[in-house]
């Protein structure tokens, strides 16, 4: 039986979805189009890259998720508290280790960008907290002047899994035309930035 599925988040607990996927496949279920948010985006992404439920279960069981909790040594100094990092970076941890982990798993399947996946195979939900907008990736990345097919899948997963104040938000910089009353400065492009976080908000 072929189905479409949406995987919700739930932090590390959401990773337990790997067992549910394995159980479903043992009952003959095949996942066609998949979508996910937060930790559910990780499961959906691995399925879209043709990892089986058993593969995902083994990956989860053998991954020390504490390895994602890394930050620059300067923010580990006693004179510089994690609170300062939170103030400066908007998160306790960067999220780079998570993105790298996902990218390595995807590269093993020949996947880097959404252009490497069949159309409509994967959708990832994230939140633009700067503009108060829910994003469905890759399509909505067009809002920022980017090509959906060129968007890194691992970066999209990091966006969706960036739990506010825990992981740094992913900053997207883009150019926006600004209309001015002055004819000389009319439609002058301005550099903007948006902070993208966990799609479960």
Predicted ranges, named:
Residues 41:
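Catalytic nucleophile loop
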């Amino acid at each position: 039986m072929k189905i479409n599925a949406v995987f919700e988040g739930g932090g590390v607990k959401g990773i337990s979805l790997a067992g549910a996927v394995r159980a479903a496949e043992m009952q003959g279920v095949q996942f066609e189009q998949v979508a996910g948010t937060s930790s559910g985006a990780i499961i959906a992404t691995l399925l879209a890259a043709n990892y089986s439920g058993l593969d995902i279960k083994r990956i989860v069981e053998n991954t020390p998720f504490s390895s994602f909790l890394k930050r620059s040594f300067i923010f580990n100094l006693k004179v510089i508290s994690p609170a300062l990092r939170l103030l400066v970076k908007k998160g306790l941890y960067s999220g780079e280790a998570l993105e790298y982990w996902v990218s390595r798993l995807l590269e093993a399947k020949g996947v880097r960008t959404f252009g490497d996946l069949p159309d409509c195979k994967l959708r990832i939900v994230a939140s633009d907290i700067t503009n108060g907008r829910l994003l469905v990736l890759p399509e909505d990345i067009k809002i920022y002047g980017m090509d959906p097919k060129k968007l890194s899948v691992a970066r999209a997963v990091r966006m969706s899994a960036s739990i506010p104040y825990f992981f740094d938000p992913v900053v997207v910089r883009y150019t926006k035309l600004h209309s001015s009353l002055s004819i000389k400065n009319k439609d002058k492009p301005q550099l903007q930035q948006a902070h993208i976080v966990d799609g479960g908000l």
